[in-house]
């Protein structure tokens, strides 16, 4: 066999010369123990808090506990395939998600991966999930209305762009329905409103049944509202770290619009389940428990999330992010730990009651306990003009109604107050999926506070409202247009409205 030494040495020299340093250098550690979605890892000495790490098989995790001899990592996904002694790699990146208009119309998980089967999302930008909220200087006070389309809310507890308004109540009181109607109400503006008024919606489902989320998406799709919405879903079967992360991921997606001079709305449904997921993680990471076994920083968990909803100043592009966090109470107990925390963080709350819901008052808003700490700054002048007196009248009505149960002989003024109150309560009822434009709400409430309903039987109030609205849409379109453009009721408009009401009242029987 002929061995050509010169040829072999030439080949070897060539290989040595062209040797590429292809070895991957990354800091690695070993899994010491794993279980319940938590891994204890030894050896990741320089890992950062909140950094993404990678387990074999592409499973991701996030370093939360940095201790002297090990790192506590929460696992995003199943921990079944991870075993003791496995190698864990640092990625060097803090947890981030894709953001931007490419996500509109999509359903994603807490890490921004699509779960709707419509193919990959090619987002140009990524953003960290946990960033610092805007300071005091970049902010501006809330002054533009964020219309929900619900009379009871827009008239009595108005929400402004950049506000955080808590929706709180027991299970099955219509909390999700309020968020859904608010999202559907933005369709009219998206279809033919100016770009500056458009409100992009993010809905974060935390710990809900998959069937419920699918139903929500289906309604949005059928009504053409999915095109301006992003759904972030961490369902009940997802691991606790995903449920903990989902609100932060959704918030980062909403902040993209806020920071680019646009307006966004985010609904967290619901933060009670996020707190439960966080409690589970904290206890498994051996952090000391506090009240109701929640960790000491559960207040900070919610405050740092909700402080990111803000109205930015004109220098910063005048964008806004409005938050509608949801909290589920147990037996109408608003004084539990998480409800009191979130009430103290937010700028007001919409309190929903089981009793009202079963009485057929829907949305089941308790007007006495609900407040908006922004108030009439978040209403157009026309709404202030008509809704100014309604809250006082309803408060008086509730007080009188409690007394009226005992006495039968009531004087005329009390009787009048009770009649008016019953009709106003009836007027504020609204079926689901039928949000009203602001100018239509103004016209309807105008009829209520000016005594046009006083002679109509309570049972006929809804029929009167429907009839009057269809009459206005056909005969009095000019009146509605004037209210929409002028955003106020001038004496001239008032006269026309009264004329339209008189005409309609004659024909209504």
From Swiss-Prot:
Top EC class for this record: translocase
Superkingdom in the source lineage: Bacteria
Keywords: ATP synthesis, ATP-binding, Cell inner membrane, Cell membrane, CF(1), Hydrogen ion transport, Ion transport, Membrane, Nucleotide-binding, Translocase, Transport
Primary localisation category: membrane
GO cellular component, one term: plasma membrane
Membrane topology: Peripheral membrane protein
EC numbers, comma separated: 7.1.2.2
Subcellular location: Cell inner membrane
Catalysed reaction equations from the record: ATP + H2O + 4 H(+)(in) = ADP + phosphate + 5 H(+)(out)
InterPro entries: ATP_synth_asu-like_sf (IPR023366), ATP_synth_asu_C (IPR000793), ATP_synth_asu_C_sf (IPR038376), ATP_synth_F1_a_nt-bd_dom (IPR033732), ATP_synth_F1_asu (IPR005294), ATPase_a/bsu_AS (IPR020003), ATPase_F1/V1/A1_a/bsu_N (IPR004100), ATPase_F1/V1/A1_a/bsu_N_sf (IPR036121)
Residue(s) at site: Required for activity: 370
Subunit structure: F-type ATPases have 2 components, CF(1) - the catalytic core - and CF(0) - the membrane proton channel. CF(1) has five subunits: alpha(3), beta(3), gamma(1), delta(1), epsilon(1). CF(0) has three main subunits: a(1), b(2) and c(9-12). The alpha and beta chains form an alternating ring which encloses part of the gamma chain. CF(1) is attached to CF(0) by a central stalk formed by the gamma and epsilon chains, while a peripheral stalk is formed by the delta and b chains.
Family to which the UniProt record says this protein belongs: Belongs to the ATPase alpha/beta chains family.
Record's function text: Produces ATP from ADP in the presence of a proton gradient across the membrane. The alpha chain is a regulatory subunit.
Protein name: ATP synthase subunit alpha
Gene that produces this protein: atpA
